[in-house]
């Protein structure tokens, strides 16, 4: 057990002895916060560990929770799990600890254990805001597991408790679309059909309606709610001038076995390297997939943005001297539109991931064709359209094609029409 930690206002002597019994939880929390602010997370953890072992027992579960939070932030997940388990062992109704324990299980690839913790929060009559949190976690993870009816039911319960949750409305609507649950905009609780309609995501709206006004409304609402307004000057203006090849940067979280990742490898490979330098800026989870290896090899430079905040990501793009930044994500799942709001490149373009307007103020151009953005729809597009001939969508011609299945392998008769 680490040495007791003295509670000193300046945190300058974190090892002087003091009787744990004399310390209140408030004392410990305040000192731990000072240690964290000083960059000494290890001492803050040791402080909690000492107080949990030898301090008064009344609020020990809270100290275990705080310790678990620190350990989780340091990615010491096994120790964080032990701390949260101790917290709920000491106080079984401690909803905060169960919520965090569920997140740890999810991160560890144990979805059923995560779901069990969040259901336990609901079974123990937690405060309403924590029940909402638990229902939302259940809905999100159940959707990820493709258990769509259960996911929809969970989000419905959340919205019955609080109908003023735009992101939850968005997912609820999309879940009904996935299940072909008609009508999609079925009122319930305090939510009207119109509120469900206006809460629809852009991608869901593009499949629900061909009305360009509704599509632009969905995109604009997302931007207003989710993308920060930045007053600072565009980042690219602060970069020194440079010469040489044009630097094109591709921005995406889908450079793997994803629809976009399957389409673009040959696009990257066929850039004229005498004229262009090709950069990738991605937050794709790293793996040894052959598809991801090929995508990496097709880029001259790859900058990983996973775990990097949006402002820092934009600075990395600006410092790379990117001339044209091509966003392959749009407003689809996993998008990071705030990066574009910083204006890291003098020209920013939307392409491929979203076949329509993004309404993002940092995007200048939309690469499209006569079908994605016909001239009569331009008034409903915030970007200026550049129409490619024939079809806007690239497709990798080198992609391996699976063998055509035989009728017999599908259990079909040879001499019958199906």
Predicted regions and their residues:
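Basic, alpha-helical interaction scaffolds
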Residues: 414-418
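Alpha-helical solenoid repeat scaffolds of the TPR/TPR-like class and their adjacent stem/linker regions
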Residues: 1-413
